Amino acid sequence: LLQNQDNFKHYGVVKGIERWDNLIDWEQELAAIDTYSNTGEFNSLMHVTTFTDGLYATNYYINMAAGDVSTKDGWGFKNNFDPRDMDQNQDNEWGPGHELGHMHQGAINWPSTTESSNNLFSNYVVYKIGKWGSRGSSIGTLAAYRYAPPTPWSRFMHPRDPNTLEFIPQDMTSDDANKYGLYQGEASEMHMRLNQQLWTYFERIGKKPNTIRKIFEQGRTPEFWLPSNDPGAAQLMYARNVAKAADMDMTEFFDAWGFFIPVSSFKLYAYGSFSYTVTQDMINQTLDYMKKFPTKCPPIEYIEDRRYQAGAKGNQKGISEDGGDVGYFETFQNNVKITKPVSYTVSGREYTVTDGEQAVAFELIKDGKRIWFANRFVFIVPEAVDIKGAELYAVQADGQRIKANK
């Protein structure tokens, strides 16, 4: 742990070193690397603080800037890892967790996830410290990506022609990685929630403990290696890995996340240049693989660890503007049944749900297909979605859909 001495003057050294060890232990525990710790092979992680560089991770060490926290290079990370300093600001916990996550994310990472799959570790570090809440976009945002118009996982934030809805060819380069509001071509705030949902269901509420560890362990075997030169194939391989680790058919979950929408070949710039393609045949093979598992996963694409509260800023513990009125993890944990009739009204494109607190989500179904989902009692469906003739269903924690009264 290499620091400028100014960072240690106020609190001393011991607590900062202990916290650094905590961060390493927690992340290696999550990634199932802790079982190899006695070899020393995975114990060489270092931290460096400089006054000139921003935060980054490379070659088994991470860097945090020691500059003014109000400037780009000092953003949120001027601390000595002493909890009395570090825990005053969630960024001070999140940043090291994020950069260390780059060291540990290999088994769950492919181009389009590099700046989001590591945030599973960021959120885990924050959870273990226990003062702040998790980050990431809302389920309403996911619905917009999924249905307005239907967009594949790898292209959630990519620009489209407003008339044809065709994707505009990206002209991003390695020197222009934040164009279109993207970072390295990905919707990191949204993408990070996928793994957070898996962790929340399998680990936090204990439905299938050690599933996340199995995902990492399997991801380090030839059967589930993610091909670095074929991100489309890696995307679907990851879905298979999760299904095998959970011993569940994960079709519904990954469908909600846009994994099963074909992707016409495009060039993705994400720490390199990659051709990203997902064909219908690749999708069909993955769907066939899912059928091997007789148990269907509950609708955990709706699970949340944040309750909705308007105006809740700063990733507060358990509440967020990005949270939901329904779908909180306790509903899944207790396998709550819907015992009250759920009703709704529609005004234009605004839906208002009454007596729906026992549900985990609400779905609009048209011609037998889901065309929208929400986890709020009041939600607006975009013009891009044809709601004529659609009916609203309340989703129970076990996956049963119950038609609501209009």
Q: What are these language model-derived features?
A:
Residues E18, E27-E29, E41, E93, ...:
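Glutamate identity and glutamate-enriched acidic tracts
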Residues W132-T251, A256, F260-F274, V278, ...:
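Long, well-structured alpha-helical subdomains associated
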Residues L2-T200, I215:
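Catalytic cores of extracellular degradative/oxidative enzymes
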Residues P231-F377, P382-A394, G399-Q400, A404:
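Beta/coil-rich, acidic/histidine-enriched accessory regions frequently appended to metallopeptidases
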Residues A31-A32, S44, G54-T58, A65-G74, ...:
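A sequence-composition feature that detects small, non-aromatic residues
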Residues Q3-Q5, Q28, Q88-Q90, Q105, ...:
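Residue-identity detector for glutamine
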Residues F8, F42, F51, F77, ...:
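Phenylalanine-focused residue identity feature
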Residues N4-I62, Q218, D230, A245, ...:
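Ser/Thr/Asn(+Pro)-rich, low-complexity disordered segments
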